[in-house]
Amino acid sequence: MVNFNQFLKQAQSMQKKMQEAQEQMANTRYTGKAGGMLVEIIITGKGEVEKISIDESLLKTEEKEMLEDLIKVAFNDAKQKCDEDSQNSLSGALNGMSLPPGFKIPF
């Protein structure tokens, strides 16, 4: 049987590591690019858009649909990087603790 005090210490350690990982993620920026850098989006580790840069060549009425597509692609690129980094950070924070199948961390 697992020692309860040992389990409690392990849980507290995991909580501290998770908190540190969340703080690190919140301070990290992810850049997504599309159209060969015609559109660039920077998001925070919380998935919030911080900045959008659009090449002037796309600021024409006839380029509206392409611009919309490029913004979507750039955002998804940045979000994917953020999500991958988040998973890697959390894996390190959990450091060998097994979670139940399907358990997902809420950020």
From Swiss-Prot:
Any Gene Ontology CC annotation: bacterial nucleoid
Main location: cytoplasm
Organism of provenance: Rickettsia prowazekii (strain Madrid E)
Record's function text: Binds to DNA and alters its conformation. May be involved in regulation of gene expression, nucleoid organization and DNA protection.
Keywords carried by this UniProt record: Cytoplasm, DNA-binding
Protein name (database record): Nucleoid-associated protein RP866
InterPro entries linked: YbaB-like_sf (IPR036894), YbaB/EbfC (IPR004401)
Localization of this protein: Cytoplasm, Nucleoid
Protein family (similarity comment): Belongs to the YbaB/EbfC family.
An annotated Gene Ontology molecular function: DNA binding
Quaternary structure annotation from Swiss-Prot or TrEMBL: Homodimer.
Gene3D superfamilies xrefs: Nucleoid-associated protein YbaB-like domain
